[in-house]
Amino acid sequence: MTDMIEQSDDRIDPIDGVLADGVLADDVLAKEREQAPAPGELTPFAAPLTVPPVLRPASDEVTRETEIALRPTWVRLHPQLPPTLMWGYDGQVPGPTIEVRRGQRVRIAWTNRIPKGSEYPVTSVEVPLGPPGTPAPNTEPGRGGVEPNKDVAALPAWSVTHLHGAQTGGGNDGWADNAVGFGDAQLSEYPNDHQATQWWYHDHAMNITRWNVMAGLYGTYLVRDDEEDALGLPSGDREIPLLIADRNLDTDEDGRLNGRLLHKTVIVQQSNPETGKPVSIPFFGPYTTVNGRIWPYADVDDGWYRLRLVNASNARIYNLVLIDEDDRPVPGVVHQIGSDGGLLPRPVPVDFDDTLPVLSAAPAERFDLLVDFRALGGRRLRLVDKGPGAPAGTPDPLGGVRYPEVMEFRVRETCEEDSFALPEVLSGSFRRMSHDIPHGHRLIVLTPPGTKGSGGHPEIWEMAEVEDPADVQVPAEGVIQVTGADGRTKTYRRTAATFNDGLGFTIGEGTHEQWTFLNLSPILHPMHIHLADFQVLGRDAYDASGFDLALGGTRTPVRLDPDTPVPLAPNELGHKDVFQVPGPQGLRVMGKFDGAYGRFMYHCHLLEHEDMGMMRPFVVMPPEALKFDHGGAHGGHGEGHTG
């Protein structure tokens, strides 16, 4: 890094035996692996939580960039494990926590310092589906005798960094094709003109994001402002970033964990008839890492803490519960004060009751949490991932949760008074969006795997309304009819389905749009839209039985079910850029595309889905220039529509 940086001293201890360019001596690694445990022998809560160092770019001389270098590194994920080869920002996993003030414009040179010919840190395999009634084999460590994917092993260090949540121009956003190799830098400028929030940065390279992020290329980014300062929230050692991610590890011939990162997925179709290729489901691993360590513990005082949580997993949706020594949920101590785009208007209690039984965290979602440990001195509390078929804290292998542990909090008795009081109002500047704001409309359909022409994968379909249904054949491939709450049936035709299809959405800067994601499959997709903050307007249940996979369209209309209301959760009413879209359901979100121009992306944030095609571009330009656009797909109904 350059001398333009203020950085904390909280660095992670180095691994003995690391040579130049991040290479670990062979004899050191061999000796470590000889002493490695079997998969079931890892002890939970055996190592303290590591906290990434804080990097504060200098506030003056914006024309001089801050360099953050991508480097190979060796990380001990658990005290009982051999070192693990990873790639990290500034050689750390996660990368440094970048902290800026609102309006502090910074330029970052994301420089690739991973030497050519470096070993790729991730082993990738696809394994057969197990017998019915048995746990999915992807949550079991080891390759199970399956040969690694040689094409993944041959991947170069090719990366582009996306600052997730940032309002910045398209040239700075981390366009997936614009990845750089060794010695080159991605130069990005971030205005940071945004309310206080937690963003995060991660690799976004086309086709290979799922492996690059697993290799360690992620970190968090905090924007501060005066409104946040006035709240007097816990800070310093009492503000802790928690980047959680599930991982899997390979084993040696004796069944011992060798520390090697393993991307292990399950084949659900051996040979798709359209492509001849196998179809696998996204990655879910058995081990949870927090800040790059498996099942750590944190020593905390009996006071208030602020936890800045990010789900940095490829695909796992965590259902988090805070439990005590007897596996009972702990109510009354956790309060959510912010989400993806900043502070909520008021705190939301997370009591693990009927209102919020779990803290459901999909990949890329962020949660700003206040935790009150004042009455818990001398106690040990555990944050766990609750499986669908077991109580909190209990393994649920059939539900995909082989090990529920996430981390442990060990509360010290200090007998010191903590004068912090939970504010009644968090953000006086927050304004709730409503449907009567002039806006345009978009309809995006998320199709089930196995739909005609999809190669066995779910897809994003951009839809355009057909004003006269006589203009299209019904039923037909790519044609969907939808019956709304008013009983009217509208006909839509597909205009795009893959990333490289023609540009479909061109948006005038400064305009509002309502995007409706209609999920016709049972798979939950966390959808992410770059550039803009959105608010969830509503959810609607649908009867999707009229959609025919073999046809690739509807034989009878997909129908909104007015008799099945879907209430919004109290903690999803703030600014968000990732939205959980289960199916069959329609999700309506409203956002304003302002502050930047350029070409951006929206996509499913299950990284395997993103890499396999669930990603589409959109363009934002000045509305004055949009009048001369020849693309013809700019705004649905256009700014000014309120219906």
From Swiss-Prot:
Cu cation 4 binds at residues 435, 439, 441. Keywords: Antibiotic biosynthesis, Copper, Metal-binding, Oxidoreductase, Repeat. Residues 87-224, 494-621 form the Plastocyanin-like domain. Belongs to the multicopper oxidase family. Homodimer (small form) or homohexamer (large form). This is O-aminophenol oxidase. Its EC number is 1.10.3.4. InterPro entries: AmiPhnlOxPhsA (IPR054642), Cu-oxidase-like_N (IPR011707), Cu-oxidase_C (IPR011706), Cu-oxidase_fam (IPR045087), Cu_oxidase_CS (IPR033138), Cu_oxidase_Cu_BS (IPR002355), Cupredoxin (IPR008972). GO terms for biological process: antibiotic biosynthetic process. Cu cation 2 binds at residues 164, 202, 605. Could be involved in the spore pigmentation and melanin production. Catalyzes the oxidative coupling of 2-aminophenols to form the 2-aminophenoxazinone chromophore. 2-aminophenoxazinone synthesis proceeds via a sequence of three consecutive 2-electron aminophenol oxidations. First, the o-aminophenol is oxidized by two electrons to the quinone imine, which then conjugates to a second o-aminophenol molecule while still bound to the enzyme. This product is further oxidized by two electrons to give rise to the p-quinone imine. Its cofactor is Cu(2+). It comes from the Bacteria. Cu cation 1 binds at residues 162, 528. Cu cation 3 binds at residues 204, 530, 603. Cu cation 5 binds at residues 525, 604, 609, 614. One of its GO terms (molecular function) is o-aminophenol oxidase activity. Optimum pH is 5. Binds 5 copper ions per monomer. It catalyses: 4 2-aminophenol + 3 O2 = 2 2-aminophenoxazin-3-one + 6 H2O.
